[in-house]
């Protein structure tokens, strides 16, 4: 677990962190990333997609871990659409994992 965490992550996400560790084989290796600016008061974020279908969100300015998400397929595809990039076919297994996580309700943990 990272030590540079936001208060939100420290206080609200320990259950999800344990779940990811136990049932998703951990975070996995980051395979792609996107800068996302939703107008949050603390600024833009970096959303990193991992080989295990996890989206790791860090604050762009501070580098603090904000949250980890068990991705849904449309979340992943939205990043590519927003940047005008094609989804790399070699990463199709990540979409399959995201579909499975969605069916199993993992994204609600």
Where are these regions (language model features)?
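Ribonuclease/tRNase effector modules and their secretory precursors
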Residues: 1-109
């Amino acid at each position: 677990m990272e030590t540079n965490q936001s208060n939100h992550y420290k206080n609200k996400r320990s259950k999800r962190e344990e779940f990811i560790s136990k049932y998703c084989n951990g975070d996995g290796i980051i395979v792609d990333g996107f800068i996302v600016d939703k107008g949050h008061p603390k600024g833009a974020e970096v959303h990193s997609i991992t080989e295990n279908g996890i989206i790791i969100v860090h604050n762009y300015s501070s580098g603090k871990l904000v949250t980890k998400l068990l991705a849904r397929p449309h979340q992943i595809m939205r990043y590519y659409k927003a940047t005008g990039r094609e989804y790399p076919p070699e990463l199709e297994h990540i979409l399959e994992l995201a579909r499975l996580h969605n069916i199993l309700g993992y994204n609600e943990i």
